[in-house]
């Protein structure tokens, strides 16, 4: 995330490049926070299928896995917060909880934690 604007400052981006960067930053952020997190994981609200589809596509653009996998991992995190079964256990350090856990081969029980999302037709 830091390297992309840094590269642009050194080598120069057009206004279109900077605009697309800003728009996609916001759109993918909304896809993850509103779509994957609030809608799929916590079921905070209901929306038409086309809105859900748009949020899932935007979340997919963030390259943080599918909505079903992301939700399963996050529900597992809530079920086992800061214990050894927590996929992004903060007790293992900032870098591990932020991105290192993705490299850990410990499998997530997607069938248990992601079954509700897998049954959604969207």
Indicate residue ranges for each PLM-predicted region:
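Non-catalytic, topology-defining segments of multipass membrane proteins
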Residues: 1-122
């Amino acid at each position: 995330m830091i390297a992309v604007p840094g590269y642009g400052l050194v080598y120069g981006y057009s206004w279109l490049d900077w605009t697309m960067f800003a728009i996609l930053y916001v759109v993918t952020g909304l896809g993850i926070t509103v779509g994957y997190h609030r809608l799929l994981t916590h079921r905070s609200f209901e929306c038409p299928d086309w809105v859900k589809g748009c949020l899932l596509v935007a979340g997919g653009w963030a390259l943080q896995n599918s909505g079903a996998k992301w939700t399963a991992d996050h529900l597992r995190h809530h079920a086992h917060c800061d214990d050894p079964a927590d996929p992004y256990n903060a007790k293992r350090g900032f870098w591990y909880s932020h991105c290192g856990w993705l490299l850990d081969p410990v499998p997530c029980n997607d069938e248990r934690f992601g079954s509700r999302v897998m049954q959604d037709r969207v």
